[in-house]
Amino acid sequence: MSDTEKSAQAQPNESVEPSFRYNAKLAQGIEEKWQKIWDDEGTFWAANVNGDLKDGKGHNAEGRPSYFAMDMFPYPSGKGLHVGHPLGYLATDVVSRYHRMKGENVLHAMGYDAFGLPAEQYAVQTGQHPRITTEQNIANMRRQLHRMGLSFDNRRSFATIDPGYVRWTQWIFSRIYDAWYDEDATNPSGSRGCARPISTLVEQFESGKRAIPGFEGKAWADLSEAEQADVLNDFRLAYISKSPVNWCPGLGTVLANEEVTAEGKSERGNFSVFQRELRQWSMRITAYGHRLIEDLDTIDWPEKVKLMQRNWIGESHGASVHFDVETPNGVKDMEIYTTRPDTLFGTTFAVVSPEHHLLENVPAEWPAETPEDWKGGYATPVEAVKAYRLAAEAKTAKDRVDEAGEKTGLFTGLYAINPITGAKLPLFTADYVLMDYGTGAIMAVPGGDQRDYDFAVKFGLPVIYTVKPLPESGDDLANYEGKAPFVSHDGIVINSSIDATKAKGDSLSLDGLRVDEAIDKVNAWLESAGVGKGTVSYRLRDWLFSRQRYWGEPFPIVYGEDGTPHLLPDEQLPINLPDVPDYSPKTFDPEDAESNPEAPLSRNEDWVKVELDLGDGKKTYYRDTNTMPNWAGSCWYYMRYLDPTDTKHMVEKDEFDYWMGPDHNKTAGKSGGVDLYIGGVEHAVLHLLYSRFWHKVLFDLGYVDSMEPFHKLFNQGMIQAYAYTDDRGQYVPAAEVVEGPADANGEPTFTWNGQHANREFGKMGKSLKNIITPDDMYENYGADTFRLYEMGMGPLAESRPWNTRNVVGSMRFLQRLWRNVIDETTGEVRVTDGELDTKTLKLLNNTIADVTVEMEAMRPNTAIAKLIVLNNHLTSLDAVPRAAVEPLILMLSPIAPHICEELWSKLGHTESLAHADWPKADERYVGQDSVTAVVQIKGKVRAKLEVSPDIDPKELEKMALEAVADRLGGKEPRKVIVKAPKIVSIVPAE
């Protein structure tokens, strides 16, 4: 912090006279007083319609519309909060307080997302149980948030590690595990596709209504328990998969796709990640792909977040096509998905992922006349495939699909049969085909795809063009033949016809059709021939749901001696974490791709091996030693706020309908959900997508009545700050940096311990040594000044720079308000009960109207600017009228509640203003005599103010300087030219 900043920070505390001046010490006393009153009186208790939380301390639910506002709850880090963290919390609090004053029953609470890797890593280092560390961190964070004056209903607070909460997380997993997705069923919203209990699928198998996959012709009762479990596993929404996963030896755990960077490294720790085929829990989120996209239209979210989810889900329309593959073990089926079935006539080879099951059927010898460069230098296909698989395992997914990388691959010795033409297509394996994307197999059309073209050129494979440019394009296929593929969806189909004698079905000709027409026609042909059909695919992969870690929710699953999974009954929940001798998963050399996961829970053998009676006598079972990912607890926490004391229900129906049901208030709409959810855009894909998925499953199963969890989403910006480095590039404490004179270019200079320091602008963080904590602000200014400054820095959705020297301006506003009501010398109230003059009446009512609009639109910064104008006007009066200052106090109270409560009390009110009526403007005085004043700096417009036509030039100058204080960097301008009431031109100091 520079000397200027230090002096500015000290300024509010330098003067202790007069006795009743509003300063940091007085503010602290007022704030602690009112926080205790709020706690003691249950001021912010939200009233439920029934149950233990029905008491609203005189403000009960009957006849009052509900409003549910919440924040993305924090992870309780040992670092605590810095001033950048509370921006969203303060915004939600301002909105909550405003809606309370509108007469609404407001639910505003805070929980803690307490499972997570940092606490586990600390436990590994110290041997201290992560619960101890986490609960200490929660206590500190709860203290910091309480000191901020946030209007939480503290009866509803919880942490995701609480056994009572873990119970319901495991209960939800159980419901998802015990469900399947019936694409033919109608869900409660009326659209196709619905999760149903797995028992309904069993009924279909038992009745013969549905064939049993892999056991056609057999009765369900004839299958063994293990066989039945395997069949159902392929349908369950939570299922055990053995498929390629992201194995990170350096962390000792498997990662979800979303936890791997674009460089193929772990998001945490930057360790290498390898593709391995391991047994893991997954969730069938892909079943909900279409609904997750479609229902975005029903919710009020930022368009950029909706776009991010649409792109992540990646819905595409195409066809599923079946190719016969001739193997030594008989003809096998190879299913591919393509968005361009019209190009089937141009397919000249096929490619499967190195992990594809067909590679278990390669021949012992190379087919006759196999080109040498197809063999990769290996004597047999078996040797070639084995070596290629090992090489592929060592590559990251990013490396494998890199368009610029060299195309590798080799012939498998197998041939696939084109289902339309009957042509034999050599089947290659190549690592650019991923098993977890599509079906792990592709039909290659080198005439229409650059990657296929490059592969065909490398291996001497034929190229057939099946689309030519549109005549009106001016392009010609001759420009591409023998040189490049023609990659376009706009074109005319050629070389694409077959007669019935050669085809599996009727004759087919696509020649002369445009691509879209050809796709429709070939899809119909594929379905009629029984070799394919039009279908939808998604970029989204199923959610990898297990971790080889300790600090997470255990799975409510045990395994029999034969490995068959069994769901534990609800009455045995929660399954709590046992003590273990070592909290860390076994980690390996970060480059050891062949290592295998060893979870910490496996070390407590007494916990793992249990004797249970699950309905057929006591038997030995083995607990699952994986834990759920940290996303599990955050998927549903919003619902637990409705009543965390309820031990009988995850959420009781009447409470859900009142707080979150469709049309529960005027803005909820048919989607229902939380009325306002504020948090960072960085959660757009992971947390928000996972929460929507879980919610939709619970919606389908009848446990909740809204389609969506969050009706309105708002992403706050980031508070940024300057950081400083020495000449070695090492960060130095910002608080110890001294600002010096400007250099020859007019730029400020900085020193640290007498040495030159470099300034950079960006994030605030511990590693950058530029953290300022809320505790610093409370001590030097008070919580209300801190709240006022953060809410007034700029639009909530935009990032903005923190500048401690400008906090003083916020405190001065509160000091002026205080002086308008309280005599600083005597402490007596100094307002009058006289009538308002016309000018004050107009300004007051216009301010009420304008501030109401700004509060509805979540623009507290512009609301503050308008309140400053009104307060400045009252300061100019000989006597401050009660009729004007009381509405001012009410309007400011959501932003600076403590000082407003104190002034409200001193003005003779005995009830908290938290539930006072929001002021209403007298329309007779609204919209009159207002002009827009433009504030310029160096000729550029930097602010606009709505002011009275007869505003005093000095008052306009004061307003203008306050409006652009951040841009002036706390320095006095060199010159200010005021042309009231329309222009203020500022020349900044050099």
Give each language-model segment a name.
Residues 2-11, 15-70, 100-109, 133-139, ...:
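Conserved oxyanion/phosphate-binding beta-strand-loop segments in alpha/beta enzyme cores
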Residues 52-134, 158-169, 336-339, 418-455, ...:
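N-terminal catalytic cores of NTP/NDP-binding nucleotidyl/phosphoryl-transfer enzymes
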Residues 92-93, 105, 360-470, 475, ...:
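Catalytic alpha/beta core of large soluble enzyme barrels
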Residues 113, 184-191, 234, 239-246, ...:
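Helix-rich, typically C-terminal accessory recognition domains appended to large enzymatic cores
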